[in-house]
């Protein structure tokens, strides 16, 4: 119907106005307050799909890192949208063997349902990791070393990762197409400029690129999109007995936060007022100030 038609009846206009008011009442207040409208989420989605397709067109051998958390599940969803229902490159899970049972159950179920070409590579034991790192950072570094082994095994020239600038200060320094050295390291002081969606998608000789399609998203964006698209989630994100997980990692170095948010709607309301950092439950983020950056420089996500 043409809403601007001159021959619409007064009665018809009244019905449209009433319908509009009804739709406004159904729109969650939190979505309006944060500006998480359909248009906003569509713009985020379109930009991310563009990045996926750009990476696929310009790199020879890609993989999507799947950590099983809310961000990487959105990444799988976006990849399926970008390529018409299927992910045309492997999903790579670098497994520490210490994830929550709910995470492994989720992985097994949705690998089948989403038709993923899943590669699971185990991390080296803690004894093989730099003993000078603080305990949680040393545990997390197993993933860095496991990723290096997977790169050497498969020869990927591009790894797609679901990091966001808003979740941690070191990640705020990242680029969408981020070059890594021959050992997988990241030089935070030497990064290519990125203007107007013009990306340098040429990996250094013998090295690879990290591609970050949701770098520009926020935690609230992730949850609003998950709600809109009805993306499956791991139940640990929802509050039980006054606690929930905002960020999921290894069970031995990840703790829940105080929360009564037992639905995505309640999570969005909580995020609108909380002063608690997203990664407050990660033991790694409470160790030495430079521990996380040391890990990222060495190749951590």
Residue ranges with predicted function:
Residues 2-301:
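Nucleotide-activated chemistry modules centered on ATP-dependent adenylation/adenylyltransferase
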